[in-house]
């Protein structure tokens, strides 16, 4: 076994400390692989991956010594820099009661069914028990009736969704290639560099109001690990295929509204709306609408990738957290002018089937989201890090939970990954065991015959909101059978 001198303690970045203690999980579904070769291929691939990225064998632990004298709650990754043997970071199981075909084609599940899938397939619980080791990453390969499910749980202290996607890219290459390329980015140097990017920008006004300690709450009998199970009876999980062509139509319509109305929030104008702005605005509109005006607590949380918002841009292949939740006000009623323009646009284009009032509400929510995202600039990010640096206690810090949350994995190229002969390409990608109200835009599937791939949305919704959501004309207009 390696000696003590090879033990490493890598301090997490300030942005890492702004995320809660969760273990999200990617579930990659493969139909009918060569089951006898899967175990050997994955084990050999992990051995190569560990040699390239030894920190993935580690645990997240509190820092000690001189570092802790400067601030409380500082965390680091403890691992062996040069392991002599691969650690058991993958386990193999069988469950012939499950089917890739059934799970991947299911359009809706109860919360209990979804949590059961997470408990069966995930190597780590979503909400870890503080008394147990907090692992950087763990894998589980489960053989089911018609294929294999490869699940990767990762600590949100160490990876954001984009970073975990890049790790999976490296893993696929290690499984496929006899001699994979080394990681061309020094992850530890970048992680430490984030402590020093604030420069002279100072602290963003009101930033402490956006980031605060988690409130105390009553834990269920099973502790933190049982939180998803406690929430499960009160929720529904929906999976929708959303027509890319119709999202494009609504995006163009909303941008026509924008050009006619010149949406402003304070002193700042919104110049354009993206397809993702429109889709998240639409799902927010479908979720809850109060004809009397803004719903109390109706803010919209959107996860924003910060890598390309710094100047110069942060390396795309960075594993660590470079994301932040943008909190946008939502669900305000459209103005009379907005309704009038929406009525005109709907009347002029027979392809627009939703009601003009729904289009106007969608437009307002999309503009609110775009305006909020556009405020996350280079100066804002550096100021955010400056504020984190000023905190004497970093544990735990997190953003408050808005009325509805969205995160997008559409940019992840997980469907393009080739795991080689034993597994091949991924047939389906999901996640399980999350909590409402959350919309996840899943990775973009391969396009068929040159057409734009449909949007793939996983939606965690409370049971009380589910009937109203399913009745919404906007949603019926967009979904693909």
UniProtKB/Swiss-Prot annotation:
Pathway: Secondary metabolite biosynthesis; terpenoid biosynthesis. Pfam families: Transferase. Its EC number is 2.3.1.-. One of its GO terms (molecular function) is acyltransferase activity, transferring groups other than amino-acyl groups. InterPro entries: CAT-like_dom_sf, Plant_Fungal_Acyltransferase. One of its GO terms (biological process) is terpenoid biosynthetic process. It is an enzyme of class 2 (transferase). Keywords: Acyltransferase, Transferase. Monomer. Belongs to the fumigaclavine B O-acetyltransferase family. O-acetyltransferase; part of the gene cluster that mediates the biosynthesis of anditomin, a fungal meroterpenoid. The first step of the pathway is the synthesis of 3,5-dimethylorsellinic acid (DMOA) by the polyketide synthase andM. DMOA is then converted to the phthalide compound 5,7-dihydroxy-4,6-dimethylphthalide (DHDMP) by the cytochrome P450 monooxygenase andK, which is further prenylated by the prenyltransferase andD to yield farnesyl-DHDMP. Further epoxidation by the FAD-dependent monooxygenase andE leads to epoxyfarnesyl-DHDMP. This is O-acetyltransferase andG. The gene is andG.
């Amino acid at each position: 076994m390696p000696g003590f001198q090879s033990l490493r303690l890598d301090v997490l970045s300030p942005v890492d400390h702004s995320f809660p203690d969760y273990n999200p999980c990617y579930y990659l579904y493969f139909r009918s692989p060569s089951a006898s070769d899967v175990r050997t291929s994955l084990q050999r691939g992990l051995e190569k991956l560990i040699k390239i990225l030894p920190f993935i064998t580690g645990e997240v632990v509190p820092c000690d010594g001189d570092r802790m004298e400067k601030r409380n709650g500082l965390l680091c990754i403890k691992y062996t820099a040069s392991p002599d043997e691969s650690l058991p970071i993958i386990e193999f199981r069988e469950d012939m009661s499950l089917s890739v075909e059934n799970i991947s084609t299911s359009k809706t599940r109860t919360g209990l069914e979804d949590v059961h899938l997470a408990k069966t397939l995930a190597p780590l619980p979503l909400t870890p028990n503080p008394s147990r080791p907090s692992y950087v990453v763990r894998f589980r390969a489960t053989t089911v009736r018609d294929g294999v499910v490869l699940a990767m749980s990762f600590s949100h202290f160490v990876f954001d969704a984009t970073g975990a996607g890049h790790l999976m890219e490296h893993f696929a290459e290690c499984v496929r290639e006899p001699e994979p390329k080394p990681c061309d980015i020094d992850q530890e140097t970048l992680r430490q560099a984030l402590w020093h990017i604030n420069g002279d920008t100072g602290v963003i006004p009101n930033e402490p109001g956006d980031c605060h300690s988690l409130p105390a709450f009553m834990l269920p009998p099973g502790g933190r690990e049982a939180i998803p199970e406690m929430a499960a009876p009160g929720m529904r999980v929906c999976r929708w295929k959303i027509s890319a062509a119709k999202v494009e139509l609504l995006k163009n319509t909303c941008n026509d509204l924008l050009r006619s109305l010149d949406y402003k929030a304070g002193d700042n104008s919104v110049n354009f709306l993206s397809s993702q702005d429109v889709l998240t605005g639409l799902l927010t509109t479908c979720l809850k609408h109060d004809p009397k005006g803004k719903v109390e607590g109706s803010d919209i949380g959107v996860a924003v990738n910060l890598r390309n918002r710094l100047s110069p841009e942060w390396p795309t292949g960075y594993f660590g957290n470079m994301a932040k939740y943008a909190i946008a006000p939502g669900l305000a009623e459209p103005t009379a002018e907005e309704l009038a323009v929406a009525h005109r646009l709907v009347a002029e284009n027979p392809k627009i089937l939703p009601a003009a009032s729904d289009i106007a509400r969608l437009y307002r929510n999309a503009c609110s989201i775009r305006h909020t995202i556009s405020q996350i600039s280079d100066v804002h990010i550096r100021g955010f890090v400056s504020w984190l640096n000023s905190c004497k206690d970093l544990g735990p810090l997190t953003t408050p939970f808005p009325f509805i949350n969205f995160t997008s994995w559409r940019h992840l190229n997980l469907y393009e990954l080739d795991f080689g002969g034993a597994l091949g390409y991924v047939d389906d990608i999901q996640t399980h065991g999350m909590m409402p109200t959350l919309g996840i835009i899943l990775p973009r599937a391969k396009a068929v015959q040159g057409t734009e791939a449909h949007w793939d949305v996983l939606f965690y919704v409370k049971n009380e909101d589910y009937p109203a959501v399913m009745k919404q004309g906007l949603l019926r207009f967009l979904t693909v059978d």
